[in-house]
Amino acid sequence: MTSPSAASEGSASGRGSKAWSCSAFAVALLLLGAMLWTLFEKNLVSTLTQQGWTRELYGISAALTKLRFGIGGSAIDQRLYATLARSGLTEEPNPDAGVRFPDNLRDAQLLQSALLQALTIDLPPPRSANAKGEYIELIGFSGEDTGLGAYTYLAFRTFGVNIPGLTYLYFVIVTAALVLYGIGHGRSVGAMAAVVAVVLALYAVVCADFVNFLGSSAFFRGPGIDVKDPRFLGTIAAIPLLHVIVMWTRPPYRLGPLDYTVVAMQAAIFAFALQIRSPVVWAVLALAAFWLVAGALVLRRGRSLRSLWDWRQSRSAPVPVVVLAVLLSAQLLAAVNLHPLYRAQGDVPRHMFWQGLLSSLQLAPDWSKKYGASANGATDDAMPAQVARIAIMKLPPEERQQYLKRDGATKRTALEKFSRLAFFDILRNDPKFVAHTFFIDKPARAWQSERQFFGGLFSGLPIWNALIPAAAVLFLVVLAASNADALATLLATAAVIPFFIVVAWLPNWLVLLNPMVMIDNFVWIVVFLVLSTVIAAAAAIRFVSGAKRRSAVAASRG
């Protein structure tokens, strides 16, 4: 579990250090087990949720398209998509099935039957592009992140074609990241304590009421999500992110080839999260800024620029270079392998930014009064689509076709373009309205989401779910109180976490704010609260113990 090149921290060495590190690793694994058990308690393993089923339908369809016909590049066979819908994965289930929406999403037998129908239905491979370059039987993800298709395909290959495999794969990936973390930081007791805090934060989010089929607390009563939802799957980047943070916050140590291999593998998990959930790009921006500031501070303290490029130093430039190289390579690989139907149909293989930005203006209380008519009264996600449609219809007939599909629907690329134009038009003509939305209405909505998260923690769950975090924090306090070097590492790590909390909030602030999209922000807030509590309690214990020892020494001398 430990890299031979990683040096131990000061006095925290030998058997005591190894025992604490192994104990921390075991606690992190137990917390992951508690997470999975909680999902079983909430009946979220074999089922789908109202908030996430449409995204998962795209992912399942893409995975089955690749499994059956070997067609990748995030292409979806429309016939398989339709088969899944007819078999029950829809908001309008067949009355003969004897189940209504959303109860069909909780019927594990019906969902499995739908998967088997799509897997076994007798179909020839989809036809290639016609003379006009059109793919009649294939579609894309319609403006959603395409990495969910790769995730679902990997789950089906690993666990078979079933819904529970989508949950199990999450834990396989997070466990792999935890093992890699242990290999890279196993000799640092403080670093291992920090990863316990991250896993504890993930556990806390699973215990929130919005991670449920339907919230039941006083703070959240709407449809929720589960770990299969891309908005939660983005958290597979949490441990890889902590891995590279701690490389710069723990005391400097020597690196070897194994350390760089581990960093590259963590970066690969990070890149996978970015494909599944594009707003995770916040972590890339935060890391880049963190490295630049940390590097500047290192140079200011007297180290030469040449020493900063010493690849054997943990606080060296080659580490971020490796991480960024892996992330960039993954993005390029995904772009190269993208099916040509995306270009042909004007689809976008990621979450659409400008559509979300324009749609977020609806958070303003007076949006409907001021701008509702300009969108023909359309609301929510339909509003940007209607705005784009109106703009396209104002164009001369010969210019419209480039923005429309063969069935007359608006292309996703056109939706992004006209959403951007509409947003800047409102910003230019009514900057006060936009400023009020972003600096008054959105922060208020963010605060409401924070209350929904913390207010709904452990709602409807047995008491043991709340006792687990208390036991984990108590363990961390004892660990930190017993080891001054570990306490120092935790203090340095906690000091930079607020920066990551703020940056994690930026994608939500720019687009929409609700508990489901703010999960990354919640994770790092909980990490900071846990580390702050542990540091304060451990410091107090060490202070009292030191005072008692000094008193005893003084008494013996007297």
What annotation goes with each model-predicted range?
Residues Y168-V198, P240, L474-V478:
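Transmembrane-helix motifs of polytopic, lipid-linked glycan transferases
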Residues F159-I173, P223-K228, V434-A504:
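Membrane-interface anchor segments at the N-terminal boundary of transmembrane helices
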Residues A62-G133, L341-R445:
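Membrane-proximal stem/loop segments at transmembrane-domain junctions that anchor or position
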Residues G182-S217, P257:
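Transmembrane-helix signature of polytopic, membrane-embedded enzymes
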Residues G133-A177, P462-I463:
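Loop-to-helix entry region of an early transmembrane alpha helix in multi-pass inner-membrane enzymes
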Residues T2, G14, A283-L328:
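Perimembrane helix-loop-helix junctions
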Residues T235-V262:
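Membrane-interface transmembrane helices that cradle and orient dolichyl/undecaprenyl
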Residues V262-R277, V322-V326:
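Membrane-interface alpha helices of multi-pass inner-membrane proteins
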